[in-house]
Each structure stands twice: as structure tokens, then as C-alpha cells.
């Protein structure tokens, strides 16, 4: 890949249009030439496909609606989102970018990671699992639920990092300490899913109460990791992603600002 992300996006989108008739039809209808992408302004002309429309296209032309730009034999997994929408995933190292989050959090060789995200149909569990392995950590594939059993696992295996929703992390930590005592709690790192409300205040309380550092990322089933925390304020955008903040009605790029209801549009560097 080149050092110019826009050049790589142009090459990838041009190649994809020759392999995916659904994508080519959308480009043609919008008068969009992917080979001419060289800036963020060019990406702003890219026709956006909403999930609702993709669902209809997949029902009419299963399984992927004409948008698969790879040889079917190269598809490693097919994830399923509500609808259902089928999302093909090629084999990707590092959990499609989640290894960057683990590295930022200081998780690596010698750590025991309890991964409580779902492992079936959706990508969360598998991507986190792959990323933890990529940085050299040992993974316990806990999955969803079984609080008492997972609390015992934490106490008896010396788990040092937990990947979980905020609510489930709290349930696990309380169960471990109440059942096995504070000395059984060896967890130092928590990679948490977000919650409504003042989530940052809740995280600060978790850090103080349970002696952990908390970390988070922004990701989707389609792209994997988009941005992640690195210890400073805010999020760092994955180096292979271009993120736009757009007005959902007009599609125009807007400056970030508090109190606005906007949407993210993300383009990714890829090899085809």
C-alpha cells in the first residue's frame, strides 16, 4: 500500500466496482468515478448506502446484494446483523484493528483476557479474540452470561483484563469480590462497551473502586475498529480509516460540535 490513503481508496474502490455489480451500478447512477478520488472532498460525492436499502437489495439478490468484491472462497466468515443483513468478512490480522486498542491499553504477553462479548453471528467476540491473540495475550472465550461461573474463572485463573459491557463488568467485579474476596481480584484493565448517560463519570468511579484502567473504542461490524482511546482525551482514528462528520439530511460535511445530531461516514483503506 502507498502512503497516500486516498490513492489506496481510489484503487480499492475502482477494483471493487469491476467485481461487484451492485457497487458499480450505484457509482454509475451517481456519476461517481472512484479512480478520481484524491481528497476528502471527492469522498463527499460517494453515494451512501443506508442499511435499510442494503437489506432490500440483499433480499432481492441474496446473499450480498451484488456488493461482494472478493472471490467467495476468500470470505472467512459471514456475520449477521438485525434484518437480517449478511456481512462478509475476509481474513484480517489483528482483529481488524482492535489490536491497536490492546496496545494502547498496555495489554500483551503475560496478560489473561476474559472476553465476554458474543461469539456467534455478530463479530464482537471474534474480533476481540483475534486482537488479544495478536498482541500475545491469553484469551478465555467467556461469551455472554454465566456470571457466577465467569466470576470463578476470574478468581481462579488470575484474569488481568476483561472485555465486557460496562454493566456486565460491574456485575462480574462485584460477584468476584463478594464471593472470593478482594485478594482474588487481579484485574488491571477493562475494555468496556459504552452506555447511555454520563458514561465517563461511571468509568472514573469504576477505576477508583476496582483499581483498573478503562478503555474504549468506536467500531462497526462492517469495518472493525474505526477509532480508539490511547490515554489522552478523545479518540484516535485508525490510520487506515477516513472519517467525515456529516449532516444526516444534506450529507454535507460539518465541523464537530456539542449538541448536534450528526452522522459519521467512514471510508477504509483496503487491498483487493
PLM regions: where:
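Hydrophobic alpha-helical segments that mediate membrane insertion or helix-helix packing
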Residues: 81-82, 113, 132, 243
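Nucleotide 5′-phosphate-binding alpha/beta core
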Residues: 1-104, 108, 185
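AMP-binding (ANL) adenylation modules
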Residues: 32, 119, 268-272
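Conserved ATP-dependent adenylate/AMP-binding module captured primarily in the ANL superfamily
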Residues: 98-112, 147-159
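Active-site glycine/GP-rich loop and adjacent strand/helix microenvironment
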Residues: 1-17, 135-272
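Conserved AMP-binding loop of ANL adenylate-forming enzymes
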Residues: 104-137
